[in-house]
Amino acid sequence: MNTNLKPKLQRFASATAFACPICQENLTLVESSLKCNNRHSFDLAKFGYVNLAPQIKQSANYDKENFQNRQQILEAGFYQAILEVVSDLLSNSKNAKTILDIGCGEGFYSRKLQESHPEKTFYAFDISKDSVQIAAKSESNWAVNWFVGDLARLPIKDASMD
């Protein structure tokens, strides 16, 4: 891995589990984009996420205000019990190294779980660009790999996640 990459880029250098959502070829990090051999390119946004579904229009049900409100509720601890159960499952799953959060919303669970399990690699997807922006902006250590993606057709290679 190129150690000269900025931290928010470096975490995507090992994102070998992903396939181009257009042609299903392997994606590799080239400068500040994930690219395939067929020249499809997906840029790293300034907030630290990659949009692998640029053709998808965001639903009005998934607006920024909705996710900001949800983030406040989650941060207030109303769903702490769920977080603790999932964290315990990860603690008991020693062989699970690569974790996929599908429908990550504003990133509460991925962010908190990564803080508790820094030895694991977290990939988090949501179809809402607004929610992924909130997630990426609220993470300071660039440890979670954030993606906008079509949850019905995730661009992930078979058997690449635990």
Set out the residue ranges of the language-model regions.
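Conserved SAM-binding strand-loop segment of SAM-dependent methyltransferases
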Residues: 141-153
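Conserved SAM-binding loop of SAM-dependent methyltransferases across substrates and taxa
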Residues: 106-118
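Conserved SAM/SAH-binding beta-strand->alpha-helix loop
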Residues: 128-130
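Conserved SAM-binding loop
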Residues: 135-136
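A short acidic, Gly/Pro-enriched loop at the edge of an enzyme's catalytic core
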Residues: 152-162
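N-terminal auxiliary segments of SAM/dcSAM-dependent transferases
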Residues: 2-60
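Conserved class I S-adenosyl-L-methionine
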Residues: 95-105
